[in-house]
């Protein structure tokens, strides 16, 4: 009788212990993965929730943007041609920081930016005279005529990126440009001779700021960049702005 009583008490104790165990929430966290086992009264069945928490991520990346410059606000005499005006942006290095568990990324980069604003072939070219960039005619009977304003400098893109889905992200932010070099070109043929004349120290603005937006789909991007600041300093050349449309990788 005593043995039966002891066996009954033992069985009751084991049952109570099992029920107590079912009300216990077990949390294991390994390598950024949290696994929660919950078998309490809220759910009569067995339930396992797996929550993936990405750790803080910092990546070093490189980017290239190639686009067409669309000039706006230029004086009527300056007829810039879109497909003679190009923009190449090479971000040599960019640090991209994603906070823990976030879908936003903050980036700062360092790179080079070359811009070219080419005129239509209407018989005039860009020249520098008396410390001012203006227009002058090409020599008579000149062929293969081309003239442009070009700048080259160091830029610092500061971008905020929002991941919209697994494959799509949107980026926006300012780009600070340090325009170290600038020149105007006149290229033409005359008889059997080819001429290429470059004039430097044209009075470009040393620092400008652009605003850029990017739509990226699986690493293939389309960007739009607006340049609200003038290319030349005041009274050093024609005043104009530009919008750039292109591809970004």
What are these regions (language model features)?
Residues 39, 43-54, 92-99, 162-166, ...:
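Outer-membrane beta-barrel proteins
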Residues 71, 197-249:
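Predominantly the C-terminal beta-signal and adjacent terminal strand-loop region
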Residues 16-62:
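Sec-dependent signal peptide cleavage junction
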């Amino acid at each position: 009788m005593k043995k039966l009583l002891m066996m009954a008490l033992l069985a009751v104790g084991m049952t109570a212990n099992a029920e107590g165990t079912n009300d216990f929430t077990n949390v294991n966290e390994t390598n950024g993965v949290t696994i929660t086992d919950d078998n309490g009264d809220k759910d009569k069945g067995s339930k396992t929730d797996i929550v993936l928490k990405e750790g803080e991520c910092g990546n070093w990346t490189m980017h290239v943007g190639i686009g067409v410059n669309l000039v706006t606000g230029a004086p009527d005499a300056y007829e810039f041609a879109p497909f003679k005006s190009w923009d190449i942006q090479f971000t040599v290095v960019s640090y991209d920081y994603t906070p823990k568990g976030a879908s936003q990324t903050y980036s700062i980069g360092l790179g080079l930016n070359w811009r070219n604003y080419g005129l239509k072939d209407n018989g005039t070219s860009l020249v520098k005279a008396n410390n001012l960039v203006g227009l002058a005619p090409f020599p008579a009977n000149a062929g293969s005529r081309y003239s442009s304003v070009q700048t080259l400098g160091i830029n610092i893109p500061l971008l905020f990126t929002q991941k919209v889905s697994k494959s799509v992200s949107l980026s926006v932010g300012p780009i600070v440009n340090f325009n170290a070099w600038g020149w105007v070109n006149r290229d033409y043929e005359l008889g059997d001779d080819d001429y290429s004349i470059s004039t430097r120290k044209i009075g470009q603005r040393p620092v400008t700021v652009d605003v850029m937006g990017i739509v990226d789909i699986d690493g293939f991007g389309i960007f739009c960049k607006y340049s609200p600041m003038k290319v030349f300093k005041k009274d050093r050349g024609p005043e104009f702005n530009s919008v750039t449309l292109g591809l970004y990788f």
